[in-house]
Amino acid sequence: MPSPTVTSPQVAVNDIGSSEDFLAAIDKTIKYFNDGDIVEGTIVKVDRDEVLLDIGYKTEGVIPARELSIKHDVDPNEVVSVGDEVEALVLTKEDKEGRLILSKKRAQYERAWGTIEALKEKDEAVKGTVIEVVKGGLILDIGLRGFLPASLVEMRRVRDLQPYIGKEIEAKIIELDKNRNNVVLSRRAWLEQTQSEVRSEFLNNLQKGTIRKGVVSSIVNFGAFVDLGGVDGLVHVSELSWKHIDHPSEVVQVGDEVTVEVLDVDMDRERVSLSLKATQEDPWRHFARTHAIGQIVPGKVTKLVPFGAFVRVEEGIEGLVHISELAERHVEVPDQVVAVGDDAMVKVIDIDLERRRISLSLKQANEDYTEEFDPAKYGMADSYDEQGNYIFPEGFDAETNEWLEGFEKQRAEWEARYAEAERRHKMHTAQMEKFAAAEAAGRGADDQSSASSAPSEKTAGGSLASDAQLAALREKLAGSA
């Protein structure tokens, strides 16, 4: 039985149309473009020197590594990966080797120019990433290379630009020239614009008398500027401290965190006046709060005037010892009793807060001196209830004469005050002994020069103590000799 004949299937040309239709169908699968056109494609290969891009052309396009990014000397693998969809500009349809040469960065450049020009027209900011530090400034990737001069990076000149690498920042476009491929940016202009808006809103919400925290941003001869959070206010040198200072650096340094009070907000001039000392207790009020009339305090003679001597009793606090309060005897001039720089225990006889004056007495302090230590005279005033009973310190058990557990802080504070009062009594004792010795020496000299000297002349040596006190002190000195 003969085998069946196998015949190949026949396909008529008419099944796919005419030959013209066939060529047209093939033609539709091939993209046609010219130099300078922007095409889209898929990354199919990434090499060290180049990247291959499938754009549906008869051959794959080649993007040289230098045409991948506006950054210099980049690794292609850091820019693209296989499978990425990208745009590229046709540089050459066919080079000497017959390759289609493309540029990714040029495509970005062309697209970016349109965006940049539109932003410039609207006076809007552009956002980009800092990719390089060059001579004179920074290079930003804004789709093309934008130059940001160092003088326009911040409100103040920045010396070290390296920390900006990799940061995304906004800037205004101040110069644009496509023919020269020149784009100049200014972050300072953007900061001025945005900060002006923020400043206006901030100032509207800033009320006189409010307490704010800030950071010292700069120091000048006439004061210190404090950043309150985007807005700087001035603390005039007279508002930095209750005491006299010659320069702001005596009180604050750049970077210091401070608490200030708002003294004034000038909306028209957009200026804020601040005070540092207003947030601190007035030393005069502090002195008045912690000292009582009649208390004996240590001080140092700072100045002599015809009518008395000024004595500093605390930092920034000076009181006057009137010439009549220097000694029991008549004093012609203050330097007969004290000299500038002398330590002196003086008695507080008046505090005038309104006039900021303190009256002191050296004479009364010495009259009140007793060898027996009385803490109340030196700052530890006794407290009594309405029935006249002594009020013991908090945490002290009067029955056992012991401090209770849990009151260690109160005990430490009380003992510190007691120790300070005791120290002052010792200073007072030393002062009395010193002048007793001086009086004794002065009287001995007078006895040798004139046996008939008048009593007033016998005291010409400058005693600071009464006769009774001097007698008691002479006995003490004689007993310890």
From Swiss-Prot:
InterPro entries assigned: NA-bd_OB-fold, Ribos_protein_bS1-like, Ribosomal_protein_S1-like, S1_domain
GO BP annotations, alphabetical order: translation
Record keyword Lipid biosynthesis present: no
Molecular function GO terms recorded: mRNA binding; structural constituent of ribosome
Effect on the protein of changing K303A: 2.5-fold decrease in binding of POA, decreased binding of tmRNA (expressed as residues 285-481)
SMART domains: S1
Keywords: Repeat, Ribonucleoprotein, Ribosomal protein, RNA-binding
Record-linked SUPFAM superfamilies: Nucleic acid-binding proteins
Bias type Low complexity, positions: 437-456
Stretches the record annotates as Disordered: 429-467
Pfam families (UniProt xref): S1 (PF00575)
Function per UniProt: Binds mRNA, facilitating recognition of most mRNAs by the 30S ribosomal subunit during translation initiation. Probably plays a role in trans-translation; binds tmRNA (the product of the ssrA gene). In trans-translation Ala-aminoacylated transfer-messenger RNA (tmRNA, product of the ssrA gene; the 2 termini fold to resemble tRNA(Ala) while it encodes a short internal open reading frame (the tag peptide)) acts like a tRNA, entering the A-site of the ribosome and displacing the stalled mRNA (which is subsequently degraded).
Additional remarks: Mutations in this gene that alter POA binding may cause antibiotic resistance.
Similarity-based family: Belongs to the bacterial ribosomal protein bS1 family.
Annotated NCBIfam families: PRK06676.1, PRK07899.1
Protein name: Small ribosomal subunit protein bS1
Native source organism of the sequence: Mycobacterium tuberculosis (strain ATCC 25618 / H37Rv)
